[in-house]
Every structure is written in structure tokens, then in C-alpha cells.
Amino acid sequence: MIRTMLQGKLHRVKVTQADLHYEGSCAIDQDFLEAAGILEYEAIDIYNVDNGQRFSTYAIAAERGSRIISVNGAAARCACVGDKLIICSYVQMSYAAARLHHPKVAYFEGENQLQRKAKAVPVQVA
């Protein structure tokens, strides 16, 4: 049995650019890609915290250290500069591997400052 699991997550990054006329994709600072284990050209799902939009595209690398999150092409209609996003990638694996799997999660605040990294999403308390 194959399971689809969270592989990497950029939590609450801020959109710095939205370019409707750029060829598709989402440009992400190379440091951020590495923090979440997301590869260039990997499929990603994006969840817009500010407007509730959910959409899929692929990651491309932005300049290392630039703190850029640029939503491009048709996806630019789903996010505005300043919106907070959750960007996720997923991986498929066997049930046995999934039981041992830990995602790479990177948490951000302010102007895309990396606050911390984790290998799990915290348990939600009542």
C-alpha cells in the first residue's frame, strides 16, 4: 500500500512578488528550498492563508539569500504581494516507510525570516 505524506513545508512565508506574465511556477529563495527539502521543478501545493485559495504549481529557485517568494503565471491571480502562504511538497512511499517518515518543516515570520526548523508539525491541543 502506498501512502502520500508531507515531505516539506514552508510555513507562513510572505509573497514578495506576483508576476502574471512570467512563465508559470513559484520562485523560492534557494535557502528556503533547502530548509524544506524541496527540489527545483518539484510539484508543490500552495495554501494562501489570507484568501483561502489553494493551488498547485512547481518550484523554481530564486537567488539564495534574497527571501523571494514570487508567485508567477496564472497562479499570480491566487496571491498578492504581502499574502502569507503555506507551501508544501509531498512524497509517496510504502506504509512501512511512512511509519518512520518525518517531514522537513521551516517556520517563518516577518519579512521571510526563518525562525526555526522542525521534523514534525506540533500536536494541536484543545
Curated annotation (Swiss-Prot):
The keyword Nucleotide-binding does not apply. Gene3D superfamilies: 2.40.40.20. GO terms for biological process: alanine biosynthetic process; pantothenate biosynthetic process. Binds 1 pyruvoyl group covalently per subunit. The active site is at S25, Y58. It catalyses: L-aspartate + H(+) = beta-alanine + CO2. It is an enzyme of class 4 (lyase). Substrate binds at T57, G73, A74, A75. Keywords: Autocatalytic cleavage, Cytoplasm, Decarboxylase, Lyase, Pantothenate biosynthesis, Pyruvate, Schiff base, Zymogen. The modification Pyruvic acid (Ser) is found at S25. Its cofactor is pyruvate. One of its GO terms (molecular function) is aspartate 1-decarboxylase activity. GO terms for cellular component: cytosol. Heterooctamer of four alpha and four beta subunits. Catalyzes the pyruvoyl-dependent decarboxylation of aspartate to produce beta-alanine. This is Aspartate 1-decarboxylase. The gene is panD.
